[in-house]
Amino acid sequence: MKVKKETINVWGARVHNLKDVDVTIPRNSLTVITGLSGSGKSSLAFDTIYAEGQRRYIETFSAYARNFLGNIERPDVDKITGLSPVISIEQKTTNKNPRSTVGTTTEIYDYLRLLYARAGTAYSYLSGEKMVKYTEEQVLEMILDQYIDHRIFILAPLVRQRKGHYRELFESMRRKGYLYIRVNGEIKEIERGMKVDRYKNHNIDKLKVRGKDDERLKKSVQIAMRQGDGTLMIFDEHDNSIKNYSKRLMDPTTGLSYGEPAPNIFSFNSPEGACPRCKGLGVVNEIDINKVIPDDKLSIRDGAISPLGKYKNQMVFWQIDAILQKYDCNLKTPVCDVPQEAMDEILYGTMENLKIPKEVVHTSSDYFVTFDGIIKYLRDIMDNDDTSAGQKWAEQFLATNVCPECHGFRLKRESLSYKIGDRNISEVANLDLNELAEWLSNMAEGLSTNQKIIASEIIKELRTRVGFLLNVGLDYLSLNRQSATLSGGESQRIRLATQIGTRLVNVLYILDEPSIGLHQRDNQRLINSLKELRDLGNTVIVVEHDEDMMRAADWIIDIGPKAGRKGGQVVFQGTPEEMLHRDTITANYLNGIQSIQIPAQRRRPNGKAMVLHGCTGNNLKNVDVEFPLGVLTVVTGVSGSGKSTLVNETLQPILAHHFYRALKKPMPYSSIEGLEYLDKVVTVDQSPIGRTPRSNPATYTGVFSDIRTLFVGLPEAKIRGYKPGRFSFNVKGGRCETCGGNGYKTIEMNFMPDVMVPCETCHGKRYNRETLEVRYKGKSIADVLDMTIGQAVEFFENVPSILPKIKTLQDVGLDYIKLGQSSTTLSGGESQRVKLATELAKRDTGKTLYILDEPTTGLHFEDIRILMNVIEKLVDKGNTVIIIEHNLDVIKLADYIIDMGPEGGRNGGRVLVTGTPEQVADCKLGYTSKYLKLALAK
């Protein structure tokens, strides 16, 4: 292959399943890498190209610095040339810190803080009046103008609401020649030995009578300003009125003063700005009585008070019984029948000495004790228990509520009292980005000439950065939205917008499915943003399955032909136009030779339905919605329209609590009907099936237990007396003790990255020699774990206890992954299909509800076809499936559609139209109908 300076060249890539792959990627182009799930796309883009770019960057550091940067292994590749500095933008919500928001991540909030510090107008949080500040000259002029022929006193505030006798202060003032002092509003003559009550709060002001000439008045003002820390007060004897004057921002009526505004007083991550009650989080954790007493129909003896359980801690129950006896109740009385006064004492405690009879405690006399209450008991555990298990146990009884002091705005009262127009900084941060863009366009009208000059550059930067976010389809988000609540696709697009804002050039960007979670309406805006990144002088590589993205690319690399061991080859690289004339699975879907077929006849609902009333969570507008049962329902709508709020945050928690007593609270709703038609709910999301390398598809699906049972029943195992634990790599006995059942050892290299090498004893097989000697059909337990799902289906075809569970993994298109493959190496889409296969293998009654959130994430056209065939089988058995989805290939297969909108954020939250795909396509409401009509016409 001839080396060209204008290309990135990869020779002999063998990472994971790649088979000595050679590729050429044009520089300053938009390149899409596509192919089936598991074909090797991410192995090429992230584990080869990005990993090598990172390794070369790290190599420029000193050996000492490299020691702190973790393990950067050289990818298994012969050679890569033409690499630029590389930045990876993956589809992960990496920041779980509740202090991280869209505003802080994009740095837009930093500019907003600067804007309010430089152009905000301060108001008093006591009176609502505009805060003012004066120079000494201005104060002097106002005194001369307003107090002509008035007898006035000039006061310097010395003490404000502090305790003490202040004898030394009074004596110091007397020695300096001052005759009067104002104490708690009363003017007094200073006397020798004068003092006040040391245990009360006092206000003390030094007082000077106005002189007869202006020079003495000027000097008095200067002294008062200096000793009052920039503040003085004028007491007019004519009408006994007091006015406040200050060099600092001050409320002239109440005397309340603020410091000079600085950006950090608008930061909820700074002590200067954060609300003192919630420490800048906007929420506080409080004990939820509904979690402490989940079922008030039970008696206390039967476990009504959840933290106490049933009759265990005798002393506590004796104390509670003593309280109940006062109200003619006992431990067997249902909580709903216990008077509220008694429950208050049980929950919050009582200082009354409770009598516990000597017959109960088996002592010579009655026992008297006070009771602190259940709430204090829980608080003590949370505050004082050193064990994480104890604190975690107590936290299950907490509820997160809006902070009562800042009302969720996160900032101090002073910080919230600065306004531009009629909005404080938190109100602006709560606007969705469309509204924020409009506010930035109009806000300058209310600024003074000086403020406009100061703010112009800041406003320009803000408008530019907000514009980047709008261009990637995030108009429904607000700056205050927590980063932890964003989907992977949203997080990725935020990072993309941030990178466009940096205006870097000659950089290689690698993105992982940026179209995830994006409605067709916003696809073109995303593509334009990627082209803008390219046009700045960068190379953009996108791992993607989206048809529009492929057609818009400058270059396509198709990895295949299939997945796993049957993939890992470049089946095509070239332009989109050239690809249309090739015979690959991807090309056949693009040119229309293959397609996901629309069903000839759609299912009709079984006449039963689940109906939700009055949903008002997040942006939902008092939504009433019907979910017909026995059909495939797809919930659609633009990003931010309320789909996840309706299904994942309202419906799913209601069902989880109903069937499994789950504690997660649903979003607000009025009522629900139709639960009696279901017997369970299954939520299949894309979270990992395990977070350690020891977790794998075999352990998650439960088939590993069946495989171990099979091995235990073999003659050789019986002779040796082996039990199922012998074939587990997690416990001592059968595992290799050299590596602890990991199959590898970690070698510390001091000033070099740690190296993971196969265990020299078991050679990566995880088990000891004796265990591996037990074989079934010539294969050891380690050999079985190393099989792909496809191989395992053939191997266990005559074992009815094992085959069904493995066959369902094959049915969902996972025949290429290994039975013992570490869960940490599975993609989100693969993890979701492992979960789906696990549920498929279980016996169902035809009354199960399955909820899936964007199951097509990471899936190729062919993968979607296989997945939907499996889902169709579930529905054919009488079950109900609800899917949140943007992919038109899924939407067109629905029996029933619920389309939400019309926009995202505040302008969404309504059910626009419901019905079959044909009915929705014929409707002119919303954006989904337009694109669905085109999909149905293909």
Report the location of each language-model feature.
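Conserved phosphate-binding elements of NTP-dependent enzyme cores
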Residues: 1-938
